Amino acid sequence: MPAQYIRIKGARVHNLKNVDVEIPRDKLVVFTGLSGSGKSSLAFDTLYAEGHRRFVESLSSYARQFLGQMDKPDLDFIDGLSPAISIDQKTTSKNPRSTVGTVTEIYDYLRLLYARIGIPHCPVCGKEIRKMSTDTMIDQIMELPEGTKFMMMAPVVSAKKGLHEKVFDDARKGGYARVRVDGFLYPLDEVPTLDKAKKHSIDVVVDRLVMKPDIRRRLSDSLETTLALGNGIAVIETTDGGEMRFSQNYACEEHGIGMTELSPRMFSFNSPFGACPKCAGMGEKQVVAEFKVIPDRSLSLRGGAIAVNGFKTMEEESWNGPLIEAVGKDYGFTLDTPIKDYTKEGLHALLYGTGSKKYHITRFFGGFGRESLASWNGILNIIESRLTQAGGEYYNEFMDFTPCPECGGKRLSPEILAVTVGGLNIYELCSLNVTSALRFFEELKLTQTEETIAKEILKEIRARLGFLQSVGLDYLTLWRKSGSLSGGEAQRIRLATQIGSALVGVMYILDEPSIGLHQRDNSKLIDTLCRLRDTGNTVIVVEHDEETMMASDYIVDIGPGAGIHGGEVVAAGTPEDIMKNESSLTGAYLSGRKKIPVPEKRREGNGAYLTIKGARENNLKNVDVDIPLGKFVCVTGVSGSGKSSLVNSILLNELSRKLNRAHTFPGKFDSIEGIENLDKVVSIDQSPIGRTPRSNPATYTGLFTDIRELFAMTPDAKARGYTAGRFSFNVKGGRCEMCEGDGVRCIEMHFLPDVYVTCDTCHGKRYNQDTLEVKYKGKSIFDVLDMTVEEGLQFFSSMPKLARKLQTLYDVGLGYVKIGQSSTTLSGGEAQRVKLATELSKRGTGKTIYILDEPTTGLHSDDVAKLLTVLNRLCENGNTVLVIEHNLDVIKTADHIIDLGPEGGDGGGTVVCTGTPEEVAMCERSYTGKYLKPLLSKTEI
């Protein structure tokens, strides 16, 4: 009898405190708890790690070295495990060739469909291509001028690897004397040995002829032989290098354009048989972007209009200044003329050069003038020429991608784009969103023969499109690049792909699949998770969404606090059991005993506005948006409605450029008014505060510098001549040199995971003995870094500068975090709160705008309450907080809502409504308003 439970005993990974738990198999199980309580440690670092490790250990040691080996979790016992599949928040491939269609494998089925029932057309006239008769071929060949010498060849190998010795033997046996190999003609006895690792093309020369009026009979015989040998294809090459291809398979009778039998690889933009020859299937080419080189056209050349090194100064002693000044005399501009005032010809000369014309100029070096003749190649051409030189990587930031001029971004060759199914070519079909594509296949009319051929293919395509729709991704197109997807979108795509694979008996572990999903689409996601469970799988979800928890079979609540205060199973059972449990914080929110209150009144703001005009990035439809300043503002809308395009691509990038002098490039818009009311923009996301174990909350907030300076002021340090640098574990001097200040040493185990052992010299304290002997209030630098924020607050209570920074960390709910805790061990929510604390500790001007993209990711309802307290503190100081959010608890507390939509993708990109939560709740067109209404009491609406 199969096991009914997954049993874990003595789990001690990270902050887990000897956890024992039983998880029912073949059920939908939710792990929940505060950010940093140990949910991910139990789900991913224990359950998934052990499930994956056991699978990998069943393989040979040779195979294991090619697979990601996971550490053995620190636990006593675990059984009832199934093979584990993790579907986490990491974005999909950044490979520019990867698309939604290829990741979901729908594109593979589409290629098969087009190869089997696609109708070819002539790419020139658009007429349907039919098979070419032998007489038609002969008529076209007979049109060659009299006296033309030509060869008739049969292609027998087309771009295939190998030595192809049998091909040459068969040609000899057939009585043929010559072959063309990779474009070169050889007698059969002198063919070189081919490289079997390279692709080769081989044509057998069937006949060599001279065009005469009486040649038709011989031509007919030779052509029939050639077509038989070349599987219906014949190639004619004239002595001047001209070539004609004929096909018994498909060819346009009017233009003579022939095609081989359709095959799936011809529809792949990753194959030379189908890819656009100009861009090799990329659909775009990299060029120097004018808008990146000259980001602000209101500036002059002398004022720093050109953002590229080497062109920023235009003084007499600069290399380019005198030359551009000479060009300007011809085209009516000076070094002090704003770029926006240049004539069209003048701007073209500046950017693209003046050809071969020479200018007589004087360059000054060290006060001495040197005369010379020089030509001007143009800024863009100069940058392009430097790309391939040493140090050319610098110029990559000034490059941009533009659609390929040959295929217009369609990635495929014209012949392949001329093949249609249901009147659409494969690019046009992939450019439809998921809903439209599904409708296309449901309405597709086929002949009985086509239906028989395509039945199974269409079944798979419809099912996979349906899965994408069921996880709330109906607005995506199959042509969308994978690298442009958000973490939540990428995760739901992988979820849809897993459903398509129809595996049974697997343990799926998902990390907050509801991220980035509007409440409207949440029920679809829950249905999908239930479908995965009902096919015979165990589905474990790390989640904070109340709707998902209520739909689950079993909840494991981890806590009671976070970090050192967490790591225990507070409650486990059905949603009803959790709601009744008095010690469960999750139960308190689920049952309504605790809730985030609606503010009694909304802020009035300072009366100023930030106005975005003509926003057109991605799917935004030329919208104008007013953002009130001095308020807590929420941008809402279904997935794909244009929130990130408006806030991140346009507003954040433009404000960063104008206020922070950042080198950013905003999306398409006309203007932003009201920037003069702000002096700084701060983006606070959930990315790690550092990528190495050496970074920690103390280094990020600047607290470590203050602590080191404090230790350098102690009598002991002064007596020994120690400076603040002595107390850094990042530089030589005070650190332990055996572990270079890491506190641990890494021992490589090759096909086993690397082992980290505590340094036996400093015993994990990171500093050498001399440094540790320096004490402040009886504590060494290591002792201070090992304190929690809570302990540090008491210890440094007499030091206002340190206490203020520690107090803000404590206020955002990070009292349990150690001052020197490695940043790599912090969750996304914890990293975000460290950033918020850093901002809170600064003395603000009240003219800052804080931009946050889904700040509640990974946060429990209780964490959300703390986050809202911090965000409101920022607003109380006169600042503006702008968040993109789906969490209704955050939306209901906002002062102002900007709701985009109404749908995602093409159906979005407009402003549905704006106003207070009460006003939005009354809007009939707003999906956000519909779900917001029940949360606001009737007296408030």
Predicted ranges, named:
Residues 1-941:
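Conserved phosphate-binding elements of NTP-dependent enzyme cores
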